[in-house]
């Protein structure tokens, strides 16, 4: 068939693209931009101008979830070199894993260009030890599920931190840090397993990689009544016991939510 590149766009916008990613994007005939797996500040015109500066002139198309899940290979017809640009790291989305498998079955040569992802950047900004993070869970929008609570319980039993990703819909509706805190507290009240308490420490990760990025801490109860702004947002619940270095980082480096905007 041809060559397909899955390119990680990084956390917020085209400034997060690596030099290698830019060279690849400038070399292809068609760039399909994933607009639904996370918030990514890019326009067709801005991307084309950037790639023109690297000697490229690809066609650029912004793609919805339906485009990627149902029409991706139809969109690739007639092109020998195609890139899919997605927020974060391209293989963090299960949709893209399935896409790579199908591409290989169809005879495409696939190359993955990694990018900075929330999976590493959020733990890094929190000051918590990365190897102490357990499974990640997503807190969904308008869906009731005990699964995130189960993941937290499993991680805490193993002495591990938990990263919660907060869903953002294509129409812009999203789960906020406050929504997530209330969600977990309500499930605890219903389940009564003693997995968490309103006084538990939590870390809000807001607009990671954007100019208005904010990483701050508070109790779950405090966060449940705190709206820090626009997506993307994430929530970290540390393990029940912190290492001394982790505790000092939070205390000395991260602000409490009462000391930052909107509080």
Curated annotation (Swiss-Prot):
GO terms for biological process: methylation; protein histidyl modification to diphthamide. It catalyses: 2-[(3S)-amino-3-carboxypropyl]-L-histidyl-[translation elongation factor 2] + 3 S-adenosyl-L-methionine = diphthine-[translation elongation factor 2] + 3 S-adenosyl-L-homocysteine + 3 H(+). S-adenosyl-L-methionine binds at residues 11, 89, 92, 117-118, 166, 208. Pfam families: TP_methylase. Pathway: Protein modification; peptidyl-diphthamide biosynthesis. Disulfide bonds: none annotated. The keyword Transferase applies. Coiled coil: none annotated. Keywords: Methyltransferase, S-adenosyl-L-methionine, Transferase. Its EC number is 2.1.1.98. One of its GO terms (molecular function) is diphthine synthase activity. The keyword Methyltransferase applies. Belongs to the diphthine synthase family. Homodimer. S-adenosyl-L-methionine-dependent methyltransferase that catalyzes the trimethylation of the amino group of the modified target histidine residue in translation elongation factor 2 (EF-2), to form an intermediate called diphthine. The three successive methylation reactions represent the second step of diphthamide biosynthesis. This is Diphthine synthase. It comes from Methanopyrus kandleri (strain AV19 / DSM 6324 / JCM 9639 / NBRC 100938).
């Amino acid at each position: 068939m041809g060559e397909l590149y899955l390119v990680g766009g990084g956390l917020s916008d085209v400034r997060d693209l690596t030099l290698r990613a830019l060279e690849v994007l400038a070399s292809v005939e068609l760039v399909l931009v994933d607009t639904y797996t996370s918030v990514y500040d890019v326009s067709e015109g801005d991307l084309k101008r950037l790639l023109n500066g690297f000697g490229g002139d690809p066609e650029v198309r912004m793609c919805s979830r339906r485009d990627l899940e149902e029409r991706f290979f139809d969109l690739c017809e007639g092109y020998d070199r195609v890139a899919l640009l997605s927020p974060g790291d391209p293989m963090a989305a299960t949709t893209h894993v399935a896409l790579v498998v199908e591409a290989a079955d169809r005879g495409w040569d696939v190359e993955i260009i990694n990018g900075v992802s929330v999976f590493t950047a959020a733990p890094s900004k929190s000051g918590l030890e990365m190897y102490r993070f357990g499974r990640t869970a997503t807190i969904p929008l308008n869906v009731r599920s005990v699964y995130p609570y189960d993941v937290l319980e499993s991680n805490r039993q193993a002495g591990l931190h938990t990263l919660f990703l907060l869903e953002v819909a294509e129409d812009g509706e999203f789960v906020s840090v406050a929504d997530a805190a209330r969600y977990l507290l309500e499930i605890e009240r219903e389940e009564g397993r003693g997995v968490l308490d309103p006084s538990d420490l939590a870390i809000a990760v807001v607009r990671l990689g954007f100019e208005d990025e904010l990483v701050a801490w508070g109790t779950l109860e405090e966060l449940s009544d705190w709206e820090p702004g626009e997506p993307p947002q994430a929530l970290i619940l540390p393990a029940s016991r912190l290492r001394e270095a982790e505790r000092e980082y939070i205390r000395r480096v991260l602000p409490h939510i009462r000391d930052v905007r909107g509080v």
